Amino acid sequence: MGPVLFVTHGGRNIGLGHVRRCLSLAGALKKRSVECEFLLGADQGVADTVSGSGFVCRQGKGDANDVVERIRELTPAVVVADSYAFTSDYFRQLAGAGRPVVAIDDLENQPLPVAMVVNSRAGVGPDDYDRHVTPQTRLLLGPAYALLRPEFADNPGRTIPPQARGVLLTLGGSDNTNLMPRLLRWVAAELGWVDLAVVLGPLFDNRQEIAATAAAIGSRAALHEQPGDVRALMLGADIAVSGGGQTLYELAATATPTVGIQLAENQTGNLSAFESSGVLTWAGDVQYQDLEAAVRTRVRHLAENPQERAAMAAAGRKLVDGRGAERVAAAVMELAGTE
């Protein structure tokens, strides 16, 4: 089949969730010998992330005219679009270029004149799209279609110690609210015996403050800058404290009990659904006045309750099996008429 064109956004204010979802799907397509190209409305750091993953990456203005022009030049088999900035009219213009369009969505808040919608949010169903798609639109809904890297499909069993020994702190690709230094201090003070693994995303501007905070804590705190194997860090942790984006699916797949923090308004649905599924405990919004107390209470409770950690781990693995990218890749190839 012809190439697949990915159109997405990323950056310090947006994060990397959209880009990482697309990279996971592109990786699954690449395994099926499908060529993939990215057209980004993003800063150089994001472009470097895509290029470093082995894909052709072009930076454009990000508007629909720019994308339509590239569609006409490339004539891709399928166009995959993922950004909260993309409106119904934007999708309509892309579809008007004559190639099937796939929308990666998790808001269910606007008409999507596309051939296929992928939404991995827990709790989403066809009724959420009744007014937003045509009967011909194929819907791939729920965590079975979570777009994760292939290593998350292969996870060993998790040992649940009586008391937690390691905590993973991860906030995604950026830290615009400077939460990580505070989070590190809070958890270190509350759980004075645990080892702390701190993940620094590629768009973190506060590395020096985080490093100074970790140095003050001592050898218990280890910094991991853009780790190549974040799955291993998740499997090595007894608890994670995480933002409410794409990382939640990875933590569920690795059966990592989690304290969730809402970093953006669009994470509400994710966090609510994951908490209802028993996969995490939600501490609140990053602007919540009593966030420190909420985080400290929850990490201590989990650290000292192995039965609750075991229940969360089982719920996570039941919800997300890590094979979503394979399923979506197969559906994209069907859409292109090659499978």
Regions found by a protein language model. Give the residues of each.
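C-terminal "capping" alpha-helix adjacent to the active site of nucleotide-linked donor transferases
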Residues: 282, 290-307
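A short, well-ordered alpha-helix in the C-terminal region of glycosyltransferases
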Residues: 301, 308-322
